[in-house]
Amino acid sequence: MGVNDFAIERVWGLQVLDSRGNPTVKAYVKLAGGSLGWGIAPSGASRGEREAVELRDGGGKWRGKGVSRAVSLLNTVVAPRLEGVDARRQAQIDRLLIELDGTPNKSRLGGNTTTALSIAVSRAAAAQARLELFQYLGGAGARRLPIPLLNVINGGVHAGNELDFQEFMIIPYGFESFTEAMRAAVETYGELKSLLKDRYGASAVNVGDEGGFAPPMRSAEEALKTLVDAVEKAGYQPGSEIALGIDAAASQLYSNGRYSVEGKSLSREELLSLYQRLVEQYPIVYLEDPFSEDDYEGFKAAVDALSTETIIVGDDLLVTNPQRVKEASALKAVTGLLVKVNQVGTLTEALEAIQAARDRGIVHIVSHRSGDTEDTFIADLAVATEALMIKTGAPARGERTSKYNRLLEIENILGYSAEYAGPELRGVMGRR
């Protein structure tokens, strides 16, 4: 018998840096046929308690954030077990990683180790198959480009200002192509920069972790009003062309049954009232983590009150976990799933979470992390899985624009067969 070109010949890893200058894991997979795949694990600032554990060294070097132990495990424990395995058997390989780790939260090998390696395997197999990664993962029918969610005003743990909610986003959905949507977003971002500089001074246009601005604002309403002004100044229609979104990251605001928002201690009901008022006043179609990750009742109340106008998205609540998706669906606690491969630690488990959501009528949104890298894997994943949206920051900073540039490239590759997901969101806006 001849050599299987897809057989894994060599696996290795090394320590590289993410966009915050923190170490992370990069994995390589080389196949017998000569193809090379790679993947880099991102890292979040606000993390759900049930996420896969990042394995870090501790101690004094790299301020305790080194990943040399994770890289060593990849090179000495994992690599020998993968040699000779067919890289097309993604699920088998990911199950082997889960088995080798042997913990419920990947605390032995580290979710950063397994994420980087899982991505690298898929990229190697796609290269050997002479396919674009999105086509390898999604098949010949993968042709829909997601709606970009652009985090252009930062708050919470992503910024040093007084805004409690973590992200304020523009959502250019009312366009015929991804390219047109990005043009509108970039123009709006530019107008926002000018507005903020005029109103708050030059320091207001310094950018945060995800490329958004961190102006000295104090209220969500102030941020949303400014976004509407920027959309209009750019020549677009708020609501019908560019909608708005919020990631409250409410777990960061929660303590002892109350939510600390804008100098007030709010009950679940009071916080929901705030969201209702904001949705009534502004074209908000996306609301992520409106309540704490354990507050299923809060999420359910948000779905009951707002889901005809706004997608209620679980991030910390669901942590890309298929079982959590099923539980939340049974309680009618979400209408959207945020997908972060490193939350669960393997591509296979992330795909299972997406399928669990799809089976239950829950849309999915593929997402970056605040500590990200030049790896563009999530752009291909979004197209492959027909994600409604992709969340990957402002149109600034290379680790953010790399994903947008990959999506622009994919749209170009697809040519006339490319579709844009924007029209799907018009149904939500049409109910306003």
UniProtKB/Swiss-Prot annotation:
Pfam families: Enolase_C, Enolase_N
Residue sites binding Mg(2+) per the record: 247, 288, 315
Listed GO MF terms: magnesium ion binding; phosphopyruvate hydratase activity
Pathway(s) the chain acts in: Carbohydrate degradation; glycolysis; pyruvate from D-glyceraldehyde 3-phosphate: step 4/5
Superkingdom to which the source organism belongs: Archaea
CDD domains xrefs: enolase
Reactions catalysed, as given in the entry: (2R)-2-phosphoglycerate = phosphoenolpyruvate + H2O
Gene Ontology CC terms, in alphabetical order: cell surface; extracellular region; phosphopyruvate hydratase complex
Cofactor binding description: Binds a second Mg(2+) ion via substrate during catalysis.
Enzyme class: lyase
Active site: residue positions: 210 (proton donor), 340 (proton acceptor)
Biological processes, Gene Ontology terms: glycolytic process
Protein purpose: Catalyzes the reversible conversion of 2-phosphoglycerate (2-PG) into phosphoenolpyruvate (PEP). It is essential for the degradation of carbohydrates via glycolysis.
Descriptive protein name: Enolase
